[in-house]
UniProtKB/Swiss-Prot annotation:
Segments of skewed composition (Basic residues): 19-29
Name the record gives this protein: Cytoplasmic polyadenylated homeobox-like protein 2
Basic and acidic residues composition bias: residue spans: 9-18
Keyword DNA damage: no
Matching PROSITE patterns: HOMEOBOX_2
Sample GO molecular function, one term: DNA-binding transcription factor activity, RNA polymerase II-specific
Main location: nucleus
Pfam families: Homeodomain
DNA-binding span(s): 24-83
Keyword Nucleus: yes
GO biological process: one example: regulation of transcription by RNA polymerase II
Organism encoding this protein: Homo sapiens (Human)
Keywords annotated in UniProt: DNA-binding, Homeobox, Nucleus
Length: 400
């Protein structure tokens, strides 16, 4: 009985061994002699192939990529340490071109590191200078040529062109006409008046009104880069539709800012009086539709304004102000030696009563013109809150 039990147990163990052998195992890939020879040649050239090379070899030999990886890894492991060090240095030089010897003393290593850092910082400065908008094409070519022939060991003896390039680039920002430099002091108040001289003042009434007019001032050669061009708004005059610019700042602020920005008061007075003269003459012409001819004072005032130089600065107008003032006084026969603001107070009441102009922020009562005198509120600036009754003086009497 026992003898029969042993063969049964042995058969059971044999079956277990056979089942273990039948399990799926990773078969070792065998290359042919030709493929092995080709792999050895590639391994001799580069023991650390990149992924593209390994993928190409896997497609060529019709095998997975991990088989190529294992073959190269096994061949590198079988090499002696000296050969493995040589192959590693070859691969390092191929990917990272290092021309220095790996065995250097401490002083040589510090000198090489300082020279490398200086060369890198100099090249970064070159690239930053070439990206500046003021550098011309010839300057960029000169910088590129100097960068190619640069020697890091003679950096201290060479004169770097960064100062020359920086001075040339900064000179572009400092260039300008002297009149533009003078006119730029008040360019923040009258924006864009070089091309659009007449939008500084407007009446307080509706822009759609037929009698809405704009004061005209002398042009300032202001810097265009400081302020954007004024936005255009539709302007209705009768049946025609024109386009005029919206006002950005009041010229009366010039008198307020004369101490901080050096603007002459006489220059402001000259431009303001010219605008008052022209506005009064335009009112006399517009309030009488039956007269289609321009008054003589209006044409004479325009001739006087054309005689003044349009591009003169505040200091030039200061010299010309006495002669211009005498001509202004002579152009008005009804002034009798009185200032312009006193003339505005003696405007006929029917003109102020029939005028449809309304000041901003105030309501005009019906019949107020019959009970009170002349109101200067219709002649005030937009946004300037001054007295509106006739008992008090005109709001711009202090500017005349």
């Amino acid at each position: 009985m026992s003898s029969q039990a042993f063969p049964a147990e042995e058969d059971h163990h044999n079956e277990e061994r056979q089942t273990k052998k039948k399990r799926k195992t990773k078969h070792r890939h065998k290359f042919s002699e030709e493929l092995l020879q080709e792999l050895k040649e590639i391994f001799g050239e580069n023991g650390y192939p990149d992924f593209t090379t390994r993928k190409t070899l896997a497609n060529k030999f019709d095998c997975p990529v991990n088989v190529i990886n294992n073959w190269f890894q096994n061949n590198r492991a079988r090499l002696p340490p000296e050969e493995r060090q040589r192959i590693f240095l070859t691969w390092k030089k191929h990917d990272f071109p290092v021309q220095a010897c790996p065995f250097l003393s401490l002083q040589e290593t510090q000198a090489a590191a300082s020279n490398y850092a200086t060369e890198q910082s100099f090249s970064c400065a070159k690239r930053a200078l070439m990206r500046r908008p003021g550098c011309s094409l010839l300057e960029k070519q000169r910088i590129a040529c100097q960068q190619m022939g640069y020697n890091c060991f003679s950096l201290e003896n060479q004169e770097t062109p960064s100062q020359q390039v920086g001075s040339m680039c900064s000179s572009l920002e400092k260039q300008g006409i002297p009149s533009q430099q003078v006119g730029s002091q008040c360019s923040y108040l009258v924006a864009g008046t070089e091309k659009h001289p007449g939008y500084a003042l407007e009446y307080g009434g509706d822009t759609g009104s037929e009698h809405s007019t704009a004061y005209r001032f002398l042009s300032y050669n202001s810097a265009e880069c400081l302020h954007p061009p004024p936005s255009s708004v539709p302007y209705f005059h009768g049946e025609r539709t024109e386009t005029r610019e919206s006002q950005h700042a009041s010229p009366f602020l010039l008198d307020y800012a004369q101490g901080a920005y050096g603007v002459k008061k006489d220059h402001c007075l000259c431009s303001f009086c010219l605008s008052l003269l022209q506005e009064q003459q335009q009112n006399d012409w517009q309030y009488h539709p039956q007269q289609h001819q321009q008054p003589q004072n209006y044409s004479e005032g325009m001739m006087l304004q054309e005689q003044l130089p349009m591009d003169s600065g505040p200091w030039d107008l200061e010299k010309q102000w006495p002669s211009a003032q005498s001509q202004l006084q002579s152009q008005l026969p009804q002034n009798n030696g009185k200032p312009l603001c006193s003339q505005l107070q003696h405007v006929p009441p029917q003109i102020a009563a029939n005028s449809p102009l309304l000041p901003l922020g105030q309501d005009m009562q019906v019949g107020a013109s019959s009970n009170s005198g002349l109101k200067c509120s219709s002649f005030r600036l937009r946004g300037l809150h001054g007295p509106a009754t006739g008992t008090q003086g005109c709001s711009f009497a202090k500017y005349c």
